[in-house]
C-alpha cells in the first residue's frame, strides 16, 4: 500500500477533527449545501463542519432524490466541496451504492477525496427520498453487514 496522498491526509485530519468535535459536550450544528459556494458560505459563517446533501445534489442536477446519481457523480461533487473548505465535510453516500463490496469501495472513494465522514441509508434500492413516505428498508442483518464493510 502506498503512502497517503494530500487529500487522504486532509481526510484523516478532518475525520479526527470531526470525531473530536462529536465527542465534545454539547450539540454540533452542521448546515447542508450542494455545491462549493454553499460549503464556503457555511465555513465563512463559522460552522464547525459542512454537510453535502444528496437531495440537494440531485436536485441541482435536475433529478429527484431516488438514487439516480452514481457514486462517481456524488464523490466528484463532494470532492469539489471538500477542496473549497478547510472544515470537515460530511457527505451523503445514499445506500452505499450496492452490497458490502460496493460499500467498501464507496468509503475508499470518498476518503480518497478528503471527505471526513459519510452516512449511508438503510433503504432498499432503488431508494426514495428520505423525506417522502413509502420507503422500504433492508433487513437489520443486511444493514449491519454494510456497516461492518464500511
Where are these regions (language model features)?
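Glycine-rich, proline-tolerant flexible connector loops at the mouths of alpha/beta enzymes
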Residues: 49-75, 95-100, 119-141
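Conserved functional loop/turn residues at catalytic and ligand-binding sites
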Residues: 46, 114
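Hydrophobic faces of well-ordered beta-strands that scaffold small-molecule active sites
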Residues: 29-35, 50-52, 89-93, 118-120
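N-terminal amphipathic alpha-helix/helix-capping segment at the start of soluble metabolic enzymes
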Residues: 2-32, 36-45, 149
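Short helix-loop boundary/capping segments at the starts of domains
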Residues: 27, 39, 48, 80-83, ...
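Short Gly/charged-rich anion-binding patches and loops
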Residues: 17, 37, 76-77, 105
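Catalytic cores of alpha/beta
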Residues: 38-41, 97-109
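Alpha-helix-loop-beta-strand connector modules within alpha/beta enzyme cores
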Residues: 13-16, 63-91, 113, 131-150
Amino acid at each position: 500500500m502506498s503512502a497517503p496522498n494530500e487529500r487522504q491526509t486532509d481526510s484523516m485530519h478532518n475525520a479526527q477533527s470531526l470525531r473530536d468535535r462529536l465527542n465534545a459536550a454539547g450539540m454540533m450544528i452542521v448546515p447542508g449545501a450542494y455545491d462549493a459556494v454553499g460549503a464556503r458560505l457555511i465555513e465563512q459563517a463559522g460552522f464547525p463542519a459542512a454537510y453535502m446533501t444528496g437531495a440537494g445534489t440531485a436536485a441541482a442536477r435536475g433529478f429527484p432524490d431516488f438514487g439516480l446519481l452514481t457514486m462517481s457523480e456524488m464523490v466528484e461533487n463532494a470532492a469539489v466541496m471538500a477542496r473549497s473548505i478547510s472544515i470537515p465535510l460530511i457527505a451523503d453516500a445514499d445506500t452505499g451504492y450496492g452490497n458490502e463490496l460496493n460499500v467498501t469501495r464507496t468509503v475508499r472513494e470518498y476518503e480518497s477525496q478528503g471527505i471526513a465522514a459519510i452516512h449511508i441509508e438503510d433503504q432498499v434500492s432503488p431508494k426514495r427520498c428520505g423525506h417522502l413516505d413509502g420507503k422500504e428498508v433492508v433487513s437489520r442483518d443486511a444493514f449491519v453487514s454494510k456497516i461492518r464493510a464500511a
